[in-house]
Regions:
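Structured loop/turn residues at beta-strand edges in well-structured enzyme cores
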Residues: 1, 42-45, 75, 103
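Conserved beta-strand-centric core segments of catalytic alpha/beta enzyme folds
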Residues: 1-32, 92-113
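Short amphipathic alpha-helical segments enriched in leucine
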Residues: 10, 33-38, 69
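Conserved catalytic cysteine-centered active-site region
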Residues: 23, 54-106
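Phosphate/pyrophosphate-binding loops at sites that engage ATP/ADP/AMP, CoA/4′-phosphopantetheine
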Residues: 34-48
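Short beta-strand segments at enzyme active-site cores
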Residues: 46, 51, 109-110
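Residue-level "edge-of-site" marker
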Residues: 50, 81-82, 113
Length: 113
């Protein structure tokens, strides 16, 4: 099975506690997911799985992937949060690729930031 990245979008790089300090992580995630869908031309119904990487967990959303997924994607789309410090988004993309390669999904939204 071949896989391809069809679009990219991420939250901005900022110093912790700076410009977006008052913006909840879930809100940033929703913006990133909506924009990734828009750039790719895909609809939420085309996504079989959401794999969301995060550097620091938000205590208000311990599984931010599910919170963001419920807000943006169909409720049937499973979502998992990957936490691996600075390489979280890369690990999420790797995990998403694996889901496609083993036949568990055809469309995966993976990465974030």
């Amino acid at each position: 099975m071949k896989t391809a990245i069809v679009a990219g979008c991420r939250t901005p790089f900022l110093r912790s506690g700076s410009e977006f300090a008052d913006l909840p992580a879930i809100e940033l995630g929703k913006v990133a997911v909506r924009e990734a869908l828009a750039r790719s031309g895909l609809r939420g119904e085309d996504v079989d799985h959401l794999v969301y990487g995060t550097v620091v967990h938000d205590t208000q959303a311990p599984n931010i992937a599910r919170e963001v997924g419920l807000a943006v994607l169909p409720k049937t789309v499973p979502a998992v949060t990957v936490s691996r410090a600075c390489s979280s988004a890369n690990q999420a993309i790797t995990d998403g690729t694996t889901l496609i390669e083993v036949g568990q999904a055809t469309g995966v939204l993976a990465g974030m930031g």
